[in-house]
Structures are given as C-alpha cells and as structure tokens.
Swiss-Prot record:
Protein name: Coiled-coil domain-containing protein 18
GO CC terms of this entry: centriolar satellite; cytoplasm
Statement: the UniProt record of this protein carries the keyword Cytoplasm: yes
Protein's cellular compartments: Cytoplasm, Cytoskeleton, Microtubule organizing center, Centrosome, Centriolar satellite
C-alpha cells in the first residue's frame, strides 16, 4: 500500500509538471500571436503607400494580415478598412501609370517598390512557416491532453483496483512507460519553444526593415506633393496662355487687313498673266490634234493586247484540264487510303493486348529515325532539283552570249531535251521514295505481329502471377482461421502479440500485391495510349507521302508548260528585235524636239524667279509678325506663372483648413451630383458653341473664296493660318471653360468649409479618404495640363513646318520667275534676228520639209513599234502578277501540305529576287533582253566614232531632258506627298487598333485580377475557419468573450465582403469612365489632325492643278518656238554653243538629281538607252525639227496619263476621308450613348456607397467597443503577471527555509537512531517502516514535493491566477512545517515506548481520502480547477497528519 501511494504521488507530480509545461506553451503561443499582430499592423500601415505608387495585386496585403492575425479579430477588423483605401488608390494609379511618363523619378520608385515587395514576400513566407509551426504545436498539445485524460482514467482504474496485488506491477510498468513518453514530449515542447524564440528574433529584425521601408514611403509621398504643386503651376500657365491667345487673335485680325491690301495688288499682276495664258491655250489646241493621232495608234495596240489575252485564256483552259486529271489521281489516292484504313482497323483490334513499354519506345525511335531518313531523301531531291535549275540558268546564260539568229533553234531543242531528262529523273526519284515508304510500312507490320506474340506471353505470365497471389491469399485466410480458433482458448499477453504481428504482416503483403497490380494497370494504359499515337503518326506519314507524289506530278506539268511558253517567247522576241530598229529611228527625231523645249523652259525659269522674290518679301513680313506673337506668348507665360504661385498659396491655405475641419460624406455626394449636372449643362453649351464655330468657319470660307479667286496659292496659305488660329481659339476656349469649372468647384468647397468650421474632428478616416480623392483629381488635372502642353507644342511644330514649306514654295516661284524673264529676253533677241533670216531660210525650208515628211513617217512607225514593245512588257508583268496571285491562292488552299508549300516558297523567292534585280519579268525574257543589250553595246562602239558630228543634237536633247526631269520631279513630289499622307492615315488606323487591343488586354487583366481576388478570399475564409476552430479548443475559459467576438467577426466579414464588391464595382466603373474619356480626347485630337491634313491635301491638289496649267501654257509657247526653229536650224551655230554650255550645267544637275530620285531611275535608264540607240542613226542633220515635234506629242500623252492618275488618287483620298468622317460620327454617337449609361450606373452606385458607408460607421463603433474590451483584458493580464512574479520570489525564500529544516530533521533522526541501536527485540529496519515512514518521511516528502511542484508550475508558465490562492498556499505550507516540528518529539517517544505495537488502521483515513479524491471529477482543463485540486490535497494532508497524531495518543492511553 505504501509503494502504491508513493507511485500515485509521483504520478501526480508528473501530471502537474505536464500541465505547467502546457501552460507555458500557451503563454508563448500568445506572445507569438501578439508579435505577429504587431507585424501585421505595420504591414497594413506600409501597404497603402506602396499601393499608391503601384498596386497591381491589392489582395496580397489582405492575405498577409489575415494569415498573421488568427486570434485577434479586433485587429483583423481594422485591416479591411485599410484595404479599401488601398484598392481605391491602387486602381487609379494602375490606370494612370501608362499615361504619366512625364515624371523623372518613376524608375527609382519602381525599383524601391520591387525591393519592398520582395521583402514582403519573404516575410509572408516566414509568417506561413510560423503559422504551420503553431498548428503543429497545437496538434501536439491536443495529443498530450488526450494522453493525460487517458492516464487519469487509468489512474482511477488503478485506485479502484488497489486491493488486487497481481495487477499492481503491470500498472507500475505502464506508468513508467507513460512517464517516459511524457518526458520525451517535454523535450519536444522545449525544442518548439526554442524555435519560437528564434522566430521572434527574426520578426524583430523584419520589423526594423519595415520601418525603413516606411521612411522611404514617406519620402515618396513628399515627392508626390511636389508634383501636385507643379501641376498647379501648370494650371496658372494655362490661364496665361489663354490671355495671350486672345491678344494673338486681335493681332491676327490686323494682319488679315494687311494681307487683303497686298492681294489686291497681286490681282492686278494676275490679269497680265492671264493674257499670256490665252496665247498658250492656242498652242495647246495644236498639240491636242497630234494627241488624237497618237490615240488612234493606241487603239491598234489595244487590239493586239486582246489577242494576247485570248491566248492566255487558252492556256488557262489547259490548266483546267490538268486540274481534272489531278482530281482523278486524288480519287485513286482516296481508294488507297480506304484500304489502308481497313488495315489500320485490324491493327487497332490487336493493339489492345499490347502492354510492354520499352518495346514500344524502341519502335517509336526506329520510326522517327526512318522518318528523318525519308525527310533527308526528300531534301536531297529538292537539292537536286535546285541544282538542275542552276544548271539550266548557266546554260541559258551561255546561249544568250552567242548570237541569237544562228543558234535559237538549237537552243530550243537542247532545252527541251534537258528538261525532259530532268523531269524523268525526278519522276524516278519520286517513284523510288514511294516504294521505299511501302517497304517501311510492310516492315512495321511484321514487327507489330512479333510484338503481339510477345504481349501474349506477358499476358500468360500475368495470369500465372494472379493464380499465385490467389493461392497466397487462401493460405493467409487459413492461417487467420487457425489463429481465430486459438484465440478462443485462454492465452497470455505474449501469445496475443505474436498473432497481431502475423496479422500485420499479412496486411502488408496484401497491400504490396495491390500496389503492384495498380502499377501494372497504369503501365498497360500508358502502352495503349502510346500505341494510338504511333498509329496516328503512321497515318500522317502515309497522307504526306500521297501529297508529295501529287505535288511532284504538278511540278512536272508546270515545267512542261513553262518550256512551251519559253519557245513562244523566243519567237516573239525575234519579232520585237525588228520593231526596236524602227523605234531607234523615231527616237532620233525626238532629239530635235527636246532642243526647242529647252529654250522655253529658260523663259519659264525667269518668270518663276520673279514670283519667288515676291514670295520672299511676304515671308519676311510673316516672320516679323511671328516674332511679335512669340514675345506676346512669353509675356502671357510669365503672367500665368504668377497666377499659378498665387493659386498654390491658396491651395496651401485650404489644406491647412482641411486638417482642422471634418467633412461629412453625404454632403460631398450631394455636391458631386450638383457638379455633374453643371458639367452636363456645360457640355451642352460647348456643343452649341461648336456648332456656332462650324457655321462661322463656313461663312469665313465663303468670304475668302469670293475675295481670293485670282491667286489661289496665297489664299490657301492665309486660309490655313486662319484655320489653325481658330483651332487654337477653340482649344483655348475649352481650357477656359475647364478652368472656370475648377474655380467654381474651389469656391463651392470654400463655402462648405466655412459652414463646417463649427464642427469638430469626429471622423479622421473620412478625411484621409477625401485627401486621397483630391490628390487623384489634382493628378488628373496635371495630366490634362500635360496633354494641352503637348497639343500646343504640336501646333507650334505644325506652324514651323508650314512656314518652311511656304519658304520652299517661294524659292521655287522666284526661280521660275527668273527663268521666265531670261526666256523673254532671249525671245526678243531671237525674234529680231529671225525676222532678218526668215527670208533666206524659206527656200531651204521647203526642200527640208519634203525630207522631214518622209522621216516623220518613219519616226511614227518606230514609235508605234516601241509602244507595242512596252505594252507587251507590261502585259507580261501583269501576267506574272496574276501568276503570283494564283500561287498565293494555292498556298492558302494547301495549308496542311507543308512540304508542297516549302517548294513553292523556294520557287517564289527565286522569281522575286530575279524580278527586283533587273526587269520584274520572267528569266527567259531577261536573258533575251541581255542579248539585245549586247547588240546595243556594239552599236555604242559605233556611236563613239560619230559623237563629234552629234554634239549639237546631244546638247539640245540634254536641255529638253533636264526640263522633262524637272516636270517629273514636280509630279513625283506630289506623288510622294500623297503617299506620305496615305502612310499617315494608315499609321493612325494602326494606332487606333493598338489602342483597342490595349483596352482589351486591360479588360482581360482586370478579369484575371477578379478571379485571383475571389480565390484568395476563399483561401482566407478557409484559414479563418481553421483559426476559429483552434481558438475554440485553446480558449475554453473565455466562453462569453469568444461568443461576442465571433458575432462581431461575422458581421464584419459580411460588411467587408460587401465593401469589397462595391469597391470593385466602383473601381471598374471609374476605370471605364477614364478609358472612355481618354478615347474621346484621343479621337478629337485625331479628328483635328485629319481635318488639317485634308485641308493641306486640298491645297496641295489645287497647287498641282495650277502648276499643270502653267506647264501647259509653257508647252504651248514651246510649240510656237518650234516653228521658228525649223527655219533657223542652219544659221544658229552661235546659239548652239550657248546651249551646249547650258547642257553641260544641266548634266551636272542631272547627276545630283539621279541620287535623290530613286524611284525615277528606271525611267531615266530607259530614256538613256533610247538616246544611245538614237545617236547611231543621227547622221541626218535636217531631221531635228521633225523629231522634236513627235517627242512633244509623246510628252503630252504622258502628262495626260499622269493627270488621270492624279485625279483618280484625289478621288480615292476624298472617298477615304469621307468614310473616316462617317466612322468618326458613328463612334461619337456610340460614345455619347455609353456616357449616358455610365452616368445612370454611377448614380445607382453612389446610393449603394451611401448605404455601405452607414454600415461602415456601425461596424467602426462595434470595433471600438471590442478594442476597449481587449485593452481591459491586456491590463488585467499585466496585473496578474506582476502578482505571479511576487509569488515566485516568496516561494524561493520558502524553499531555502525548507532545506534548512530538512537538514535539522536529518540531524535529529540520526541522533535518535544511535540512541536506540542496543535494543534487543527490534531492528532499525523494522522501526522505520512502521513509525517513521507514515509520519515523517511521507509528510516531508509530500510537502517538499508540493513545493517543488508549485515552483515548476509557476516558473514555467506565466498564466493568471488569483493572489489569494498564492497566499493560502504559502500560509498552509508554513503551518504544516511547524506542526511537523512540534509532533516530532512526541511521536518519537511513543515509538520508543511501544516498539512492538503496530496500528493497522493508521492509514485508513488516507486511503479513504484518496478514494474520495479519485471519485471526484477534478477540472484539470482550467487554472481554477487545478488550484482547487492543490488546495484539497494540502487540506487532506493536514487531516491525515492530525488523525495519525490522534491515533498515536489513543495507543498511548490504551
């Protein structure tokens, strides 16, 4: 009994130590939770600053706060409020980032944000690790608690079975095992405590880093405030610019009056020019008659073109026949595919049995190798085809060098033989490839059959394995039945353990077999999937082979057709060679015509020089006025800066007032609604003003057209400047209206602030929100200022460009006027000399006229043949373009045919390179032309001998060429300007598309963000549920407080979710509104640019028309001079020398013009080749006049063609402009509708926001109450901790006193033992267990153990308990010690008197009390229950000591 009681006391000690350790763990968990909460608050305070700069993922901060704060819903409830601000701030910043590229500090800010985010991610990871550690500790705590309850139940069972002596040793062994387990768990818990301490240190370090990041964020905020100040300054500058623009408009009106006076002077000069134009028109009529003759020739050539088209149609019919044949071949291929599909179906039936993985992998590798070999063979075939083509080209070049007339027929025969041989070789190769593919397929089928046999073998092995497994299971079942029969018999504990071990082994074996079966099943499924993939690859290979055979056949047919075409082309080239000879004769006659044109061009240049001088004088006036305007604009800027500074001071005052005042959210919403209504009214007013402006523009245009009919060029310049100034006026008016709106808003805010001075600071959070909103609005205004500055800069650039263009035009006009003056002077001289020489030349002209008529006929024939050749070349080019289009269609149809496409691409690349290099025609035509060029080079050698005789004609031709090139330059410039405008229109359309794509991308990103937020909210809900579950298990002693907090959490979660949804909707709507506004602004700007460009196009077209008319007049004058030059051709040697010098100068100018005009090089090369050909036939000197006349007719025809092209292009441009206008109007209508819808939705959302704000206020009040309760609890905990520390110090003093008492008692015991050693009847071993153990040893042992227990529990844990309990325990322990000291001498004396007497009932009260204690249900889960249990035990010890003392006294009396 004594041993059992000592064991029981040891168990109590261990249980109490476990409880103390558990309490210490709870305390440490609380400390970690508080540290994590403080860290979460710091993160939440840092996160808004980060999100204000850049916040693409606003839900991250929310996730972190919820992860860190699982047990304090008060702080958790504060975080969503901050997150709302973060989301609202981040969305606007996220939208403004791509637009606000003006800030120079964006790059370092982004880098700092990235570093902070990396730190936050690290902190989140560490927090997650801490959370997992907390969860693991909680699970360990629950397991320990469960084991404690089990141990208590076992102890109670042992106490009830103390009388059974046989079960005592078994229970002692179990208790020892439990003690060992508990000690191991204590070690684990201590290790966990160490880890928690380390984690707390890490958290402190991270808090320091977060403070540094906060300081950086504060710096960023300061930078943002500075930027807002800059925006205010920009507003002041805008006001100054408006004032300056008004002054400019007044100055411009004065400038208009001056220009009108100058225009009247110019009109008088124009009347003189009109008289000259009438003379030019008469000459133009003569040229038109000659154009009629040339048109008749063109009709003849058109008939020839029709014949060639018929031949092309015949060729197309042949191609259709070949397509029918191809369809038949495809039908045969489909039949073959059906047979292949049947074979494949047979293979699929057999593939179900296949299960070997490695064999299939090897087969796939072999198949891939063979496919690669086949691809290599096909590549070799392609290389051979290309090599054959290269050989053909080399042979054709060799043949082209030989004389054509001798070896044309031999070359044809050789080509046909060589091509047929190459085609036959290619066919043989294709057939060989097909046969090789068939052999590969047959080999694969054989291998499949072999593998089927192997798979069947594997199947048999599997069945054998299954039978063995079934036998094993039968044996296991028999053994289990035997074991069950043995269990009926009475067996010891060791036998049962052996049977359980066998059962476990059997279960493990069964599980292993099941796992192996599952692995086999998965392997079989994988093999089946791989077999299906291999079959699909085989079918694809077969299809590809069929396609390749069909492609080779098509290539052969195309080559045959090309050979036939080449033979036809060679026959046609022989005809064209004869026609070229006739053309050469005609070109000689044209050389004479160019000489007369040179003289007329000189006169035109003089006239242009005079006009350019006038234009320069106008430019000087414009520049002076422009300087005045610039000075006025600078003054306006200075005024604007001063106003901006004043506005900044006012804004600073308003901000100081904002810190003192409190604004109500409902009143602000009302003001916002009123402001929106004002904005709508002002928008209508703006629309009406726009209409009035458009009407005024129309009226001004009509007035300008009536005034400025004489000089259209000057009028266009003036109208352009007026339009631009009006646009500036309209832009300035819009800016004024915006500034008036802002001023009205500021005045309204001032009035509201004066009314709200009486109220005090009640809602600090609302002020923060309002400040953020105003910051965003200031940023928007700054953005608008930047946009306006950009528009002003662009307009200034446009003005500068227009001034440059005007200067260029004036320079050209001056040059032309100078040329015209020179020509007039020369004409006067020539007329005086020609009047004298006409009489002499009349007789000679009559003889020359007959010869000229004969030569004109020859020239007409040559020109006709040359034109036919040109037309045929154009036809061939068109045919080539059609062929290219057909090839592109074939590419689209054959997307699946990869190999065929590669071959066609190679052919197309070759043809394109050859066309771009030389003549954009077929190879065979180029080679034939090379042969003609060789003949021309031989003729050039002859020309060098005759150059001395033809220098006069050559000089005249160069002068005319220079004039023609100038005309072409003018036309090319016009074409280039048109092309540039086309490119600008295309760029604008591309930019619109890019904007649309960016908008769609942003929408997709928003959707992705919404999905991510939903997922994170779901995860947060799960974690919150886990946290609440853990809190319920740990904190059962806080029942009432937890119920209140749970209710608050539920309400807050609902409000948070509703707020998040509303904030998301508001953000999305704000984003859409901003996007719509930006789109409208961009489109308005684009429309302004388009209108400007359209006006410029119209003006340039009018200028070109005027230039064409001037050139026509010049041409008429030139025709008049041709008649005089016929008669003066013999006696004008001196004048020819002058013209030679001019020709040399023009030659230098031509060399420079060739470098600048890349597009005109081809035409110049043709003209040079024709001139070189004409020089061979220029021996006849009398035919100069006739050639000049014919060449003038050709130039007229070309000019007519160019005019027609220009008109067609102008029509196209006008049609495109109209289509753009219509599209813009439609888009404007749609945007207006969308804007109305947005307004309706915004009003509905405002009402919802009001409701949410009311709910937020209620939630805030509840939060404040919860925070007050939490603060009270914190104070109570601190008070209790102080009490516990005082109790620990008192216990240390008591422990020292106890050690002293024990030393004294041990001394007394030794002295008494020595006294009673000579007693004969009893020994010390008999005395000690009877007397000393029950009273002294047991009492001292229990008292000392209680003290140590209390010391451990208090030192290990800092849990809260009452002061009274501590005082009671200390007083009771001291009283017990005093009583024991008093009872020692009496008990010793009695024991010496009655050594043989033993009292059997001395320990019955103790046993009774122990049974009573075991029967009671002690609450060890709470601190109060534990303290009650300790007090009960101390009282029981007192009672037992008193009872033992009374029993001894009774024995003495007896």
């Amino acid at each position: 009994m004594e041993s059992s009681s000592s064991d029981y006391y040891n168990k109590d000690n261990e249980e109490e130590s476990l409880l103390a350790n558990v309490a210490s763990l709870r305390h440490e968990l609380k400390i970690t939770e508080w540290s994590l909460q403080s860290l979460g608050e710091e993160l939440s305070s840092v996160s808004p600053s980060e999100n204000s700069d850049y916040a693409p993922n606003p839900s991250r901060s929310e996730k972190l706060i919820l992860d860190v704060q699982p047990s304090h819903p008060g702080l958790l409830n504060y975080s969503p409020y901050e997150n709302v601000c973060k989301i609202s701030g981040s969305s606007t910043d996220f939208q403004k980032k791509p637009r606000d590229k003006m800030f120079s500090s964006s790059a370092p800010v982004d880098q700092e944000i990235k570093s902070l985010r990396e730190k936050l991610n690290k902190l989140r990871q560490q927090n997650a690790c801490l959370v997992t550690q907390n969860h693991s500790l909680m699970t360990k705590f629950e397991s320990i608690h469960f084991e404690l309850t089990q141990s208590r139940a076992k102890v109670s069972m042992l106490e009830s079975a103390q009388q059974q002596a046989a079960s005592v040793p078994i229970l002692e062994e179990q208790i020892i095992n439990l003690e060992a387990e508990v000690s191991a768990q204590d070690k684990v818990l201590r290790e966990a405590e160490n880890k928690l301490e380390q984690s707390q240190k890490m958290v402190i370090e991270k808090e320091q880093s977060l403070q540094e990041s906060k300081e950086e964020c504060i710096k960023l905020k300061v930078d943002l405030l500075e930027q807002t100040k800059q925006g205010k300054r920009a507003e002041r500058q805008r006001n100054e610019a408006l004032y300056n623009a008004e002054e400019l408009s007044k100055a411009f009106q004065q400038y208009k009056k001056k220009v009108a006076e100058k225009l009247e002077k110019v009109q008088a000069e124009e009347e003189i020019l009109e008289r000259n134009l009438t003379n030019c028109e008469k000459e133009n009529k003569r040229l038109q008659e000659r154009c009629g003759l040339y048109k008749s020739e063109l009709e003849i050539l058109k008939e020839k073109l029709r014949q060639l088209k018929e031949e092309n149609n015949n060729g197309k019919e042949k191609l259709r026949i070949m397509a029918v044949k191809n369809s038949e071949v495809m039908a045969q291929l489909t039949e073959s595919r059906q047979s292949i599909l049947k074979l494949e179906s047979e293979l699929e039936n057999k593939d179900e049995i296949l299960r070997d993985k490695f064999s299939l992998m090897n087969e796939n590798r072999e198949l891939k190798v063979r496919v690669a070999a086949q691809n290599e063979r096909l590549d070799l075939c392609q290389q051979e085809i290309e090599s054959s083509r290269v050989e053909l080209r080399s042979l054709e070049k060799i043949i082209s060098q030989l004389p054509l007339k001798r070896e044309l027929f031999g070359f044809k025969s050789y080509l046909s033989k060589y091509q047929m041989s190459s085609f036959s070789n290619k066919e043989d190769r294709c057939i060989g490839c097909c046969e090789a593919n068939k052999l590969v397929i047959s080999e694969l089928r054989i291998k499949l059959a072999i593998k089927e046999a192997e798979i069947q073998k594997l199947h048999a092995n599997l069945t054998a394995n299954q039978l063995s497994q079934s036998l094993i299971t039968c044996n296991d079942s028999q053994e289990s039945s035997k074991l069950s029969s043995l269990e009926t018999e009475p067996v010891k504990l060791g036998g049962h353990q052996v049977e359980s071990v066998k059962d476990q082994n059997q279960h493990t074996m069964n599980k292993q077999y099941e796992k192996e079966r599952q692995r086999l099943v998965t392997g079989i499924e994988e093999l089946r999937t791989k077999l299906i993939q291999i079959e699909a690859e085989n079918s694809d290979l077969k299809v590809n082979m069929a396609h390749r055979t069909s492609q080779f056949q098509l290539i052969q047919e195309e080559l045959l057709e090309k050979a036939s075409n080449s033979s036809k082309l060679e026959s046609e080239m022989t005809k064209k060679c004869s026609q070229l000879l006739t053309l050469e004769k005609q070109l000689e006659e044209k050389i004479v015509a160019y000489s007369s044109i040179a003289a007329k061009n000189a006169e035109l240049e003089q006239e242009l020089m005079e006009k350019n001088e006038k234009i320069r004088s106008l430019e000087t006036n414009i520049n002076t006025e422009h300087e005045k305007i610039c000075l006025a604009f600078e003054k306006a800027k200075k005024i604007h800066l001063e106003q901006h500074k004043e506005m900044e001071k006012q804004i600073e005052r308003l901000e100081a007032q904002l810190e003192k005042k409190d604004q109500q959210f409902k009143e602000q919403e009302k003001t916002m609604s009123m402001l929106q209504q004002d904005i709508i009214c002002k928008q209508h007013h703006l629309e009406s003003l726009d209409r009035l402006l458009t009407e005024s523009k129309g009226e001004m245009k009509k007035e300008n057209m009536k005034k400025d009919e004489a000089l259209k060029a000057l009028q266009n310049q003036v109208s352009e400047e007026t339009i631009k100034v009006r646009q500036l006026d309209s832009a300035l008016e819009i800016c004024k209206e915006e500034l008036v709106l802002h001023l009205n808003q500021l005045e309204g805010n001032k009035e509201k602030f004066e009314k709200q001075l009486k109220k005090k600071s009640e809602e600090v959070y609302c002020l923060q929100k309002e400040l953020k909103i105003k910051n965003h609005s200031l940023q928007e205004t700054s953005e608008q200022n930047v946009i306006l500055q950009h528009t002003l800069q662009q307009q200034q650039q446009m003005l500068q460009q227009e001034t440059i263009r005007n200067g260029e035009l004036e320079d050209t006009q001056t040059k032309l006027e100078k040329q015209v003056s020179k020509l007039e002077q020369e004409l006067q001289k020539q007329r005086e000399s020609s009047a004298e020489k006409l009489r002499k030349m009349e007789e000679k002209c009559e003889s020359a006229a007959h010869e000229a008529d004969l030569k004109r006929q020859k020239v007409i024939e040559l020109t006709g043949t040359a034109r036919q050749v040109k037309i045929e070349m154009d036809q061939y080019k068109e045919e080539l373009s059609k062929m290219e289009k057909e090839i592109m269609h074939l590419k689209r149809d054959g997307e699946n045919k990869a190999m065929h496409l590669s071959q066609l691409d190679m052919i197309l690349d070759q043809t394109k390179t050859e066309l771009e290099k030389k003549t954009n025609a077929v190879k065979e035509l180029e080679k034939l032309q090379h042969s003609t060029e060789t003949e021309l080079t031989e003729a050039l050698q002859k020309r060098e001998v005759l150059e001395t005789e033809l220098q006069n004609a050559h000089g005249e031709l160069k002068s005319t060429l220079r004039q023609l090139q100038e005309l072409r330059d003018v036309l090319q410039k016009a074409q280039l300007s048109l092309e540039e405008k086309y490119t600008t229109i295309k760029d604008l359309t591309a930019e619109l598309r890019e904007c649309k794509m960016e908008i769609e991308d942003k929408k997709q990103e928003l959707l992705e963000m919404d999905q991510a937020l939903k997922e994170r909210n779901w995860e947060l809900k799960q974690r919150a549920a886990q946290v609440t579950h853990l809190d319920m298990t740990i904190r059962e002693h806080r029942g009432e407080m937890e119920q209140k907090i749970i209710k608050l959490e539920g309400t807050l979660e609902k409000s948070e979710l509703e707020l998040k949804e509303c904030n998301k909707q508001i953000e999305s709507l704000n984003d859409k509104l901003q996007n719509a506004k930006e789109q409208l602004r961009e489109k308005e700007f684009i429309m302004l640019q388009n209108e400007q460009e359209i006006s410029q196009l119209k003006k340039e077209i009018e200028r070109t028309q005027q230039r064409m008319k001037e050139m026509e007049s010049v041409m008429k004058e030139q025709e008049q001079y041709i008649a005089t030059q016929y008669k003066e051709a013999i006696d004008l040697g001196q004048e020819l020398r002058l013209t030679r010098e001019q020709v040399q100068n023009s030659h230098t100018e031509l060399a420079e013009a060739r470098h600048q005009q890349v597009q005109a090089q081809r035409e110049i090369e043709r003209l040079s080749s024709e001139l070189e050909d004409m020089k061979q036939l220029s021996k006849e000197k009398d035919a100069h006049g006739n050639h000049l006349a014919e060449e003038l007719g050709a130039s007229k025809v070309r000019e007519a063609h160019l005019e027609a092209r220009m008109q067609a292009e102008i029509k196209k441009l006008s049609a495109e402009v109209e289509s753009l206008k219509e599209a813009y109007h439609m888009e404007m209508i749609s945007h207006q509708e969308n804007h109305a819808k947005w307004k309706i939705s915004a009003d509905s959302q405002k009402s919802s926001v009001q409701q949410l704000n009311e709910q937020l206020e209620k939630a805030k009040l509840e939060l404040e109450e919860a925070q007050d309760t939490v603060s009270n609890l914190h104070q109570q905990v601190q008070d209790r901790n102080e009490v516990i520390e005082a109790a620990n110090e008192a216990l240390l003093t008591k422990e020292s006193e106890l050690t002293r008492l024990q030393a004294k008692i041990s001394g007394h015991e030794k002295a008494e033992d020595i006294k009673f050693l000579p007693a004969p009847f009893t020994s010390p071993t008999e005395i000690m267990p009877d007397v000393q153990d029950p009273k002294f040893a047991k009492c001292f042992h229990t008292s000392f153990s209680k003290c140590t227990k209390l010391r451990r529990s208090i030192s290990a844990s800092d849990l809260t308990f009452k002061i009274h309990g501590d005082e009671d325990l200390s007083e009771e322990l001291l009283q017990d010690l005093k009583k024991m000291q008093l009872e020692q001498p009496s008990t010793l004396e009695e024991s010496h008197k009655n050594l043989t007497y033993t009292q059997p009932d001395s320990f019955k009260p103790l046993t009774y009390n122990l049974e009573a204690d075991s029967s009671e249900n002690n609450d060890f889960n709470t601190l109060s229950g534990m303290l009650r249990y300790i007090n009960k035990e101390v009282r029981l010890l007192k009672k037992s000591s008193m009872q033992t003392g009374a029993g001894l006294n009774q024995g003495e009396n007896v």
